[in-house]
């Protein structure tokens, strides 16, 4: 698995970006240069139409404006197709108005390059990456497939990384950093 300090791999994936009936607006090509110069929060879930996954995705959606205020683009994805993403978004009330792209890694290239493809299940692990504007991975977290992650904690870590200071345990934006 790629870790902190590694370069985030190049990619080009289809994404579901809208639930409109106009198929030209429902999908987009997203690649590593789509959000050049921005922080990126890239997270993966195992499968669409499951139970834990929509709780996390909706939570990231609710915090999207907080991430945007920090000049960070949220990108979520799984190994499902963009069409499955769109069907799920249309079917699930909490996902209809997601403000970020749902990446479709159907060939499993990005999840393999990152080292977060669960070989046994053939799906993405529940992984989260914070990537800086230079495309360097600054944070990685992987949860068991059965346990959802905490998007608020991802936001807290992003805040800490953006200080370029030493942040103690349980530090939150606005708290003092360590002076050494």
Role assignments for model-derived ranges:
Residues 1-180:
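Chalcogenol-based redox active-site neighborhoods
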């Amino acid at each position: 698995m790629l870790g902190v300090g590694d370069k985030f791999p190049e990619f080009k994936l289809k994404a579901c970006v809208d639930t409109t009936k106009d198929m030209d607006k429902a999908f987009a090509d997203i690649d590593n240069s789509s959000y050049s110069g921005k922080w990126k929060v890239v997270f993966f879930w195992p499968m669409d139409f499951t139970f834990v996954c929509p709780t996390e995705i909706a939570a990231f959606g609710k915090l999207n404006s907080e991430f945007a205020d920090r000049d960070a683009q949220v990108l979520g994805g799984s190994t499902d197709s963009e069409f499955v993403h769109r069907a799920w978004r249309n079917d699930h009330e909490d996902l209809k108005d997601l403000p970020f792209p749902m990446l479709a890694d159907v060939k499993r290239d990005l999840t393999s390059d990152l080292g977060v493809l669960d070989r046994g299940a053939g799906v993405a692990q529940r992984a989260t990456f914070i990537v800086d504007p230079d495309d360097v991975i600054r944070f990685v977290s992987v949860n068991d497939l059965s346990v959802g992650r905490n998007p608020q904690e991802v936001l807290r870590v992003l805040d800490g990384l953006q200080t370029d200071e030493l942040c103690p345990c349980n530090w939150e934006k606005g708290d003092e950093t360590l002076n050494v």
